[in-house]
Design a protein with these regions (language model features):
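Acidic/His- and Gly-rich active-site-bordering loop/insert found
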Residues: 2-102, 111-114, 118-126
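Structural motif
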Residues: 55, 104, 133-135
Length: 198
């Protein structure tokens, strides 16, 4: 990883963040059943002084951090749910829930957003408002829709929202961005791919 740097305060939290991810990985929960995960997220956000709202979109969590008088606001979003599949790994933090597994990286996504929230809450090196959006039910059960219908952007208006998802195959230290909608689709109404609109 030549010429790459990690913010020292984030690097200092590496062990804690690894423990968070492993805990979430070992205790996966399906969409709209993320009770343990959302409670863990809310507890950590509160401990860092964020304003926390739970239950949006059933099990979603919003942490709000305001710094200074700037009225601009952004949303940073990560998903929390796991997939209905058995985990065959043998490491110590493998799934303890039969036939439920974090196979899509949402344990990492949740951890990364928690790490960002902790860093920004401690450093306060910006002006404005950040809404940390922890989304339930991303895996095909309509978690984003449920949050929006519960008033996500009415209660927590954002000038822009940045959603994040890991992408195997992308070089370490790189990230991709696009303007406009991303990572969105309609709920599947048919098993036929030709019936799914993107």
């Amino acid at each position: 990883m030549a010429n790459q740097t990690i913010i020292p305060e984030i690097e200092a939290n590496h062990e804690s963040m690894t423990a968070w991810r492993r805990d979430i990985h070992a205790n996966p929960e399906l969409g709209f059943e993320e009770y343990r995960t959302s409670a863990m997220v809310a507890e950590k956000l509160k401990s860092w002084g964020l304003e926390v709202h739970q239950g949006l979109g059933k099990t979603g969590v919003i942490g709000t951090l305001r710094v200074g008088n700037d009225t601009r606001s952004i949303g940073l979003r990560a998903d929390m749910d796991a997939l209905p599949m058995a985990e065959n790994n043998t490491f110590s933090h493998k799934s303890t829930n039969p036939n439920v597994m974090h196979a899509c990286g949402h344990d990492g996504h949740t951890t990364m957003l928690l790490g960002a929230a902790k860093y920004l809450a401690e450093s306060k090196n910006f002006e404005g408002c950040v809404h940390f959006i922890f989304q339930p039910g991303e895996e095909g059960v309509g978690g984003a829709k449920a949050m929006v219908e519960d008033g996500l952007f009415d209660q927590f208006p954002c000038d822009s929202v940045y959603g994040m998802h890991n992408r195997p195959g992308m070089a370490i230290g790189k990230f991709g961005m696009r303007s406009g909608a991303a990572m969105a689709c309609l709920l599947y109404t048919s098993p036929s791919p030709r019936d799914v609109e993107e």
